[in-house]
């Protein structure tokens, strides 16, 4: 069984410079292949064509896998969005492969919906289903009476994708530590980010979700141990004339929960979370690495 759709998204700047900022043509195919009564293979692929040549070109991680994403130029992209095998066995539901995992109840907000990194090539205008970057991993659901236990594990790492430098969607105010100090004002050199290793168990990400239906209300408790999707820009001084910004991804713990309550034709939703170990840029020039951490 398969479906496909064509879509065009075009935008024209009415102020200088008067030009098309994009004429983006999508072709996406979704194929579900039933292997047995208890196993199904899903493949989702997407091709983008933009004759204006405004597709982003340097925002992805080739090390994540050579079949994830291919580009011939800045007007053509082909991407394997999802490829996973789903197996249902008794009270267990297994999903192996490249996939999206969606947590949370909020509409238009990503409080707990942070399992997959996000594509910011058009800032936050894309629908989340298109903006999420699928990852290679495993999801397991176990149903026991009114309880559902979900576990996720990812050996694949990708960071958030930003728009190219010079794009109208570029983050203009990228937060970097102050490069001034009490004794020096040397311009800083930004080095390439240090990323977690794909396929390394010690660098993997994992999480759990416990869900229960209770008196017309669905409630959940969530936990996710992950890497920051944006690298933390640490400042490092190697001498009077050698000041560097060394971005590194750091570990974080997300703890939260959700609930939704249905009555008549109405549904009330709630969601909250706390991110432990989050890092923030410090404007204090006496701060050694330019970063403060929230415990």
What do the PLM-derived regions correspond to, one by one?
Residues 21-23, 58-64, 111-117, 159, ...:
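Flexible, surface-exposed loop regions and adjacent strand-edge segments
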Residues 5-11, 46-48, 99-101, 154-156, ...:
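Outer-membrane beta-barrel pore domains and translocons
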Residues 8-26, 238-245:
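Surface-exposed strand-loop-strand hairpins of Gram-negative outer-membrane beta-barrel proteins
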Residues 12, 19-27, 76-81, 88, ...:
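Residues that define the transmembrane beta-barrel architecture of outer-membrane proteins
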Residues 69, 223-230, 234-295:
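Outer-membrane beta-barrel pore domains
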Residues 8, 27-33, 43, 82-87, ...:
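Residues on the lipid-exposed face of transmembrane beta-strands in outer-membrane beta-barrel proteins
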Residues 39-173, 215:
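Outer membrane beta-barrel
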Residues 2-8, 41-43, 94, 149-151, ...:
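Transmembrane beta-strands of outer-membrane beta-barrel proteins
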């Amino acid at each position: 069984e398969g479906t496909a759709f064509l879509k065009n998204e075009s935008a024209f700047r009415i102020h200088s410079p008067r030009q098309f900022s994009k004429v983006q043509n999508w072709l996406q195919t979704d194929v579900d292949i039933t292997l047995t009564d208890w196993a199904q293979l899903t493949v989702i692929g997407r091709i983008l064509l933009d004759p204006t040549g405004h597709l982003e070109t340097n925002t992805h991680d080739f090390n994540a896998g050579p079949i994830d994403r291919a580009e011939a130029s800045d007007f053509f992209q082909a991407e394997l969005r999802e490829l996973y095998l789903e197996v249902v066995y008794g009270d267990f539901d297994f999903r192996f492969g490249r996939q999206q995992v969606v947590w949370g109840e909020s509409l238009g907000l990503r409080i707990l919906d942070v399992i997959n990194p996000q594509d910011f090539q058009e800032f936050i205008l894309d629908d989340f289903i298109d903006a999420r970057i699928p990852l290679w991993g495993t999801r397991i659901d176990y149903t026991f009476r009114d309880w559902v236990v979900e576990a996720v594990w990812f050996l694949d790492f990708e960071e958030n994708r930003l728009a190219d430098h010079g794009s109208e969607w570029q983050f203009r105010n990228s937060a970097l530590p102050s490069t001034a100090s009490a004794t020096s004002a040397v311009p800083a050199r930004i080095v390439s980010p240090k990323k977690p290793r794909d396929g390394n168990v010690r660098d993997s990400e994992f999480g759990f979700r416990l869900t229960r239906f209770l008196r017309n209300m669905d409630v959940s408790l969530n936990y996710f141990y992950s890497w920051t999707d944006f690298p933390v820009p640490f400042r490092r001084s190697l001498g009077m004339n050698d000041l560097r910004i060394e971005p590194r991804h750091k570990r974080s713990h997300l703890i939260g929960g959700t609930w939704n309550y249905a009555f008549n034709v109405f549904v009330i939703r709630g969601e909250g979370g706390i991110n432990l170990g989050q890092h923030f840029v410090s404007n204090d020039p006496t701060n050694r690495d330019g970063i403060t951490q929230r415990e």
